[in-house]
Design a protein with these regions (language model features):
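Structured alpha-helical segments in the cores of large, soluble enzyme domains
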Residues: 25-27, 189-194
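Active-site-proximal, glycine-rich beta->alpha crossover segments in alpha/beta enzymes
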Residues: 2-11, 88-192
């Protein structure tokens, strides 16, 4: 709940603004209103591997920033880890991405044989649980938006994160393998959303 002092032609005084209601009002009235809606996001590399730490960092950052909409910036590499990547989390608070020692997709055959994961996958289940806790914390007060990449972005993250050339080459050389991977990742996303 946010308290703001303000004076406008329409009213003056102190009002209590709840992020959810203020954003809803702005959408319905198609106006910005008397206050700018605030949100942001930030990777928490030191908190990513530990669910409680990640939850606390997200809540504390949103509180300090006086955010109206809570953007969950999940561990950037949870999907590769869910698919078995050998990944070492960052120990540098200024560098969100860690070090990959192996990737789940290294060739077209890996892409073609990529399975769909379900919500019982321990990595996906942990992400869902943290998101659930954050949503529960702000339920009815502020909207919460979690990050979920599209399947094509996941292909890149599972093969060569931050370097699109490998994925672009797969599009050109083996589109069938790419389509199979996209289908598996779409099913995984659907299970994750449920």
């Amino acid at each position: 709940i946010i308290r703001r002092e303000f004076t406008t032609e329409r009213m003056e005084g102190t009002v209590v603004i709840e992020g959810y209601n203020e954003i809803k009002r702005m959408v319905e009235e198609k106006t910005l209103g008397d206050k700018l809606t605030i949100t942001g996001w930030y990777h928490f590399p030191l908190a990513d591997p530990v669910a409680d730490d990640f939850y606390n960092e997200t809540i504390d950052t949103a509180k300090q920033g006086d955010w109206d909409l809570i953007k969950i910036m999940t561990c950037g590499n949870y999907m590769p880890v869910a698919y078995g990547a050998d990944y070492e989390f960052s120990t540098n608070p200024e560098k969100w991405d860690g070090v990959f020692h192996s990737h789940p997709i290294t060739c077209a055959e890996d892409a073609a044989n990529l399975p769909a994961l379900d919500a019982t996958n321990p990595t996906l289940a942990a992400e869902v649980e943290v998101d659930r806790r954050i949503v529960e914390t702000y339920k009815g007060k502020k909207p919460v938006l979690a990050t979920l990449f599209d399947p094509l972005s996941w292909v890149q993250e599972l093969s060569t994160p931050m370097e699109p050339e490998w994925t672009l080459n797969l599009m050109r050389t083996d589109p069938e393998a790419l389509l199979k991977a996209l289908d598996a990742l779409e099913k995984t996303n659907d299970a994750f959303l449920d």
